[in-house]
Each structure stands twice: as C-alpha cells, then as structure tokens.
Amino acid sequence: MNRFKLSLLALIASLSVSTMGASIDHIQNYSAEYGGNPAQQGAINVGSTVYFNPAGLMRLENGTYIVGGIQYAFGDQNMSQGGRDFSTNLSSPIPNFALYKKTDDGAYFWTMGGVGGGAELEYKDSIPLSVNLLGNSIDFNKFLSNTHVKGSNIYAQTTLGKAFNLTDKWSASLAVRGVYGKRTLKANATVDKNVNIGDLIGKPLLRIPIFREGTASIDSEREAYGFGGQFGLNYAPNDRLNIGFRYDTKVKMKFKTKSDINDNTYGQSINIPGMSIPSLGVSDALLGLYPVYKDGEKLRRDLPALAALGASYKVTEQWTTFVGGNYYFNESATMDRIGKTNVDYKNGWEISVGSEYWFTPQIAWLVGFNYADTGAPDKSFAATEYALNSTMLGTGVKYRPNETVEWTVAFNHYIYDSRTVNDIKYEKEISSIGINFVKKF
C-alpha cells in the first residue's frame, strides 16, 4: 500500500518545478541581458558581468555602478493522460539588483536576485491521478471532485565579494553567497461518496470504504537558508579575447516544513486474506505520509554546485561574439527523499552562443541561443518535479544615451522537449521579457 500512497504523492509534488530551470532547481537568468544573449560567462559589460563573471569586473572602467532590472516570465505547463489535459498558466516577475565599485586596487560587489525555482503554478481542475493498485490501474479523478492544487518554488540569493588583479592579464574574485529557499504547496479535494475497495479492484460486493465521503486539504510551507562560496578567474590575453570562469559551491539547505492538514475522509482499515490496508484518508494518499510535507519535517534539498566557463571575442570594434557553458553537479547534492527512496539525478549541462553588434555608439543588437540538459531522469518525473530539457532563443537591444547610462531590453522563448513517463505526457512553453538599467558614477 505504501507504493500506492507514494505514487499519488509523486504526482502532486510535480508542482515543485523550476519555471525556466537550467538544471533541476537552478535558473540562470540573473539579468535581462541574459535573455538577449545567454552566453555571458566570459562577457565584459557593465550590466551583467557582476553576476556571471565577477572576476572580469577588473576589466571595466573605474567607477561606482548601480544595476537594476526585472524580467517577467509567462507561459503554460501541461500534463496530459488518457486524452485529458491538466494545464496551468504561469506568470512570474524576477527582479535583480547589483552595486559595485571598481578601482585600480580591486572591485567590491554586491548582488541580489533569483537563483532558482520559478513561478507559482495553479491547477484548478486536478492533475493526473492514475495509480496502479493491487494490479489494477485506478483513475482517482473518477472518485474526487473540486481537486485544486497550487505550488510554488522560489530561491533568492545575495552575493558579497571582491575582485582583484593577479597580473595585467589575470584577475580573480572571491565571494560569499546567502540563499533563501521557500517551497509551498496547497491542495484540496472532495470525495463525493464513499469509495469502496471493491470499486477499485473490480469486486463490487466487497463494500468496505477505503475513503469516506468528505473533504481533505493541506497547506504546507517549507523554508531553508544556506550559505556558500563563489570563486572566479578572468583571463584577457589581448584587447579582443576574454575568457571567464566561475565556480559556485554547493549550498546545503535543510528545509523545515510547517503543514496544516484537515481530513474527514478516513476509511475503514482492511485486514482480510491477501489484503491488509490501514485506515486511510485522502490526505494520506495526497501528502500526509510524504516526508517532505509532514509538519515539522526537516529534509535536505541542496542547491547543487555550478561551474561556468565562457569566452568573448571582439571580431571588429562593433561586433563581439560569445560562447559559454555551465555544468551542474547534481549528483553530489543531497535532494529530497520519498521515504527511503532516493532519486539519482544526473549532472546537468548547458551550452550557449551569442552576438552583440553596435550599429551606432548608442544602439546595439543582441541575439543568442542556449541548450540545457537538466540531468533529470525519468524516475524523478514520478517523484518531485519534471525538469524538461530546453532550447532557448533570445534577442534584445542595448541603448546608451550617454557614457554613464545603459538600458537593455530583451525577449526570449524556451522550447521544451516533451517527455512521456508512466503514460503522462509533460510539456512546457515559456517566454520572458526583461529590462535592465545601469548607472555609472
């Protein structure tokens, strides 16, 4: 029977997904400029280097810089099974802020913004609830009504550090990172009439209620704080080529759950030859026995380490090209467990290319491409999330009205690979638009 409970729980938990995840919980859209050109790992510019290549700050002009922006993600996510669609629209603002001061002796920097998670997802008309029970495939949506599920998953990060020159060509950066994570889940369902075990296994004369007529609901919130480090290197062998590297350490995060469960659907325990089932309520099947959402539960779900490497090359005075990649060390991170079951995540990776062309000293055009392999195995789709591989296409415009101000507006679209796991087809389609502002003093 535990397998039955956990199967339903896994489907409910699919709400906790990263909206534009590069790999599992991670996102990379730290600034709007990423939306127009995601290959920022080796870039030198005033609006995004502080986020993606902080060691490269030593290649900028001396001064104090303030960076601020916001991105707005929108789209839909869809699960389908047996000809029925379970979809939700999403919308999410993603703000970013940075302050840094560059001198000949070094650069001090501070950033704030999103580092993982995504938008709130709300399924107003249930989700797939087909479960294998005692050799039969049971669609529990036939017995439940008013099933409503809403979940969110947000990680915010602040970084404080310093960049400094090693030689006239090499520079480095060191920083500390603080991460706050919050994952919420609300669910409710109604049992319209008693659900007998005989109805589930094709023996209508066995009229023992496994669920009774009633309602069940859960309101769960998980929070965690964690700290990590960040190390960077930048190499500029000449005026045209620049190579950047950044390593973000794993952030250990122990989530503590506060949960309020109300359930009057508990059925009768069953103990007959060949069948032993304890008294159950819908909350048990949905969430109650899932350790992640039990009140007072403390479980690790780390933010995995990340290595980023990239380069930029100035082809002409007006045109710069970019290439970069990220590698996510998911296998070394401790993730949520369902009882004693652990999902073996694979390491994830991304590759990006981009271009920036200045038509005039005031206006530039950005364009870029990114492919992400999340490292999420099929098994995870029946556990805690569905992190689909994706292709991102982006474009944008930079505007410099004078030497101390820069605006960036960008748009991107994510094309996700659909995947079918246990007869459930998972799909996403997400876009975002963003604006970024830089002021130099």
Language-model features: locations:
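Outer-membrane beta-barrel "beta-signal"
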Residues: 397-401, 428-441
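Repeated loop/turn-to-beta-strand initiation elements of outer-membrane beta-barrel proteins
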Residues: 64, 105-108, 169-172, 240-243, ...
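N-terminal, post-signal peptide beta-strand-biased segments of exported outer-membrane/organellar beta-barrel
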Residues: 17-120, 384-386
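Residue-level signature of outer-membrane beta-barrel architecture
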Residues: 58, 101-103, 162-164, 231, ...
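Solvent-exposed loop segments that connect transmembrane elements
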Residues: 124-145, 183-219, 255-296, 333-342
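Residues that define the transmembrane beta-barrel architecture of outer-membrane proteins
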Residues: 48-50, 89-95, 152-158, 223-229, ...
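Transmembrane beta-barrel strands of outer-membrane/channel proteins
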Residues: 68-72, 110-114, 174-180, 245-249, ...
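Extracellular loop and loop/strand-boundary signature of outer-membrane beta-barrel proteins
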Residues: 80-85, 142-148, 214-220, 293-297, ...
